[in-house]
Design a protein with these regions (language model features):
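Pyridoxal 5′-phosphate
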Residues: 1-103
Length: 103
């Protein structure tokens, strides 16, 4: 796949914050990803759906919401492991940020 300026413009459309204009009406460019990574619409929608319909702890209870959340969490971990070619999905650990991951 050849990456062109059109490719980047298509990707930018997925990130609502990157539609903003800043100083001198220029497109916002965000490079501080070690601190906070901007979210595409797909992530915002998934998070919103989770909080509205499935919000619960994982691996902590046997009620419906906890079971749904645990299943979704483990499916996501499996997908990430497959994408990264990791044999055991338990090696995939989600952390809140770079500092927590390093520590």
């Amino acid at each position: 796949m050849q990456i062109t300026s059109e490719t980047f413009e298509d990707l930018r459309k997925d990130f609502p914050v990157l539609n903003r204009r800043v100083r001198d009406d220029k497109k916002l460019v965000y490079l501080d990803n070690a601190a906070t990574t901007q979210k595409p619409n797909q992530v915002i929608d998934a998070i919103s759906d989770y909080y509205q319909n499935h919000n619960s702890n994982i691996h902590r209870a046997v009620h419906a919401l906890a079971e749904e959340s645990t299943e979704a969490f483990e499916e996501t971990r499996d997908k990430v492991a497959k994408f990264l070619n990791v044999e055991d999905s338990r090696e995939i650990v989600f952390v809140r940020g770079t500092t927590e991951g390093i520590n």
